[in-house]
Amino acid sequence: MKMKNTLSNGEVLFANGKVEEAEKCFLSLLEDDAECKEAYNNLGVIAFQSEDNEKAIDYFTRSLEIDPLYRDAIVNYTNLLRSLDQLPLAIPLLEKVSELNTEDKEIKQLLDDSRNPQPANV
């Protein structure tokens, strides 16, 4: 229960623009639970917004290593790859998720975009 509260607190801090405090919250959560996919995903979002792409890739990858079908991390990782003009790298991951969840329109759209990438800076 404590970990859920810490995760929620971090998400509230982030939503209120207190990014550094949110980051500390998520990092402390990982000290208690190194398998918290949500914390890794949230840290990936923070790194992505800070334009620390290497760190963002690392965090999203760690989240997906814990749960390869974690939708939030898949969407965030795909958006990061799009911003780096490397969207085709997401195809295998998106195909797998799309096969398992045929009703997910956002994943289908991301997969279509990955197969027909447009430059990020158009």
Model-derived features with residue positions:
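Register position in tetratricopeptide repeats
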Residues: 15-16, 49-50, 83, 116-117
